[in-house]
Amino acid sequence: MKNLIFKLFIAASAFMIMSCSSSVDNKNVITINAGPQPKTIDPSLNTALDGCYYIIHTFEGLTTKSKDGKIVGGVAENWEILDNGTKYIFHLRTNAKWSDGKPVVASDFVYSWQRVVDPAVGSQYSFQHEPVKNAKAITAGKMPVDSLGIKAIDDYTLEVVLEAPTAYFLDLVAFTTFYPVRKDIVDKYGDTWILNAETYIGNGPFKAAEINQDESIIMVKNTNYWNVSEVVPQELKFVLMQNETASVAGIKEGSIDFSRILPTQDIQSLMKEGLLQIKPMLASYFYCLNITNEVLSDIRVRKALALAIDRNYIVEQVTKGGETPANAFVPYGINDAEGSFRENGGGFFDISAENYKKNVEEAKKLMAEAGYPDGKGFPVFEFKADPGFHISIFEAVQQMWKEHLGIDTKIVQEEWAVFLQTRYDKNLTMCRGGWFRDFNDPINFLGLYASYSPNNYSSYSNAQYDAYIQTALTTGDQKVRMEAMHKAEELLVNSYAIIPMYFYTEPLLVNPKLKDVYYDALSMHKFTYASKE
């Protein structure tokens, strides 16, 4: 009976996917599964990768990425860099329009950036704006919102003043948190403006046609987009689902063209079938430990937990996607003043397969010193994560901790939106974490663990660490910046407030007929130029 019910569920899922598409054979319609219902698709408030999928197709910032991944003008046609790199003058395209036909003007960016840093709004990504003059003081409630270093000179000229020269600024403003939103729309509809296609007004290559809660988001080509002639698909159809088996079924029958959701245990077989591709990704996977917890406040316990994990087993036997075991936080591919930040910085503890037994012995010794010999007296901690491969990974870790340290843990699964709120509220003892590069600079990772960061889920607080981060944010000397960030990373990793697990790759289910997708190392893949053979 259970098998019959499961088969009926998969059939129903496939029917739902097909019913979302009026013509699955239409080469101008791309059907995508980026995951279940996103928590938000508001550019100013989104903090999750899945939300970015929808936002990058319906909105556009001052800059954007070309087909080959280079930073080029988006709404801004060109710009000037003045005052030793601390002032930018952006000249906006006069033919840039919102999807309802209204022009995109400089004041739209002023409103949107001020909205992000407004403490009353509470954007969790407000830290991204810290290079902008006064942003940090505003989010701390020490200065008024209108003191932010952004000003509309006229409708098509925007001035931005920075705290210090910021080499990655043009890359930064291509990120979703810097996209414009419409003040009149937000004022009129409040938080509900993102829930209906009629009010979800953007300025990107596509516009919302349907928003069906927990089912689908359907987009059509935005004829008011300034560069509409380069947009290939007529429609993008996002099916909102978590079911891995249904995703595979959809790819095989042609009702889905692309899916982030897949059964990781089947990676090798799906590759052999030609249905799966593995893409590089600049991202870190790690565990967050709440160091305000009485037991986890002891660094000996945290270090023991980290050392008792066999990362090589995880990537070879569990994830199987070509990931790299991690003994640091910032991933490979992030730039240093010269060369690679990761290669220059190296690792902070030995994670080689041949050294694992030594790590386990040290972990046992540390637990005994902390008062928990063979796990005696150690409490049963909850580990929180969203469903999917995160659970499979922790089940392996759970067994390692039980076998080598004698401790028990309990897995608590939470749906995606609930889990995001749990982490933000720090309602946890330990949980899974992951960070995908927003722009190519180590500060994008290391800034997360400044004491004031809303994304500091471990409640890590270190005055010296904050000082290093402040140096990285306020000096224009790249060598000084990078030296400070190397020192910051060393402090963070050696605190074991986080447990680095591995550096990501990204396995994706892809219809073999799908071509010309822009695959991004941030995992914000674009379908603007995609088509099907």
Give residue ranges: language-model regions.
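N-terminal lobe/hinge region of extracytoplasmic solute-binding protein
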Residues: 33-83, 201-202
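Surface-exposed binding/hinge segments that line
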Residues: 91, 110, 121-184
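Gly/Pro-rich hinge or "lid" segments in bacterial periplasmic/extracellular proteins
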Residues: 155, 162-231, 235, 243-245, ...
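Ligand/substrate-recognition segments at binding pockets and active sites
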Residues: 213, 356-360, 364-437, 478, ...
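Ligand-site clamp/hinge motif
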Residues: 223-269
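Structural transition elements
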Residues: 324-369, 387-390
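Extracytoplasmic/peripheral linker and loop segments enriched in polar/acidic and small residues
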Residues: 351-357, 408-421, 444-512, 533
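Long beta-strand-rich cores associated with HINT superfamily self-processing modules
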Residues: 508-533
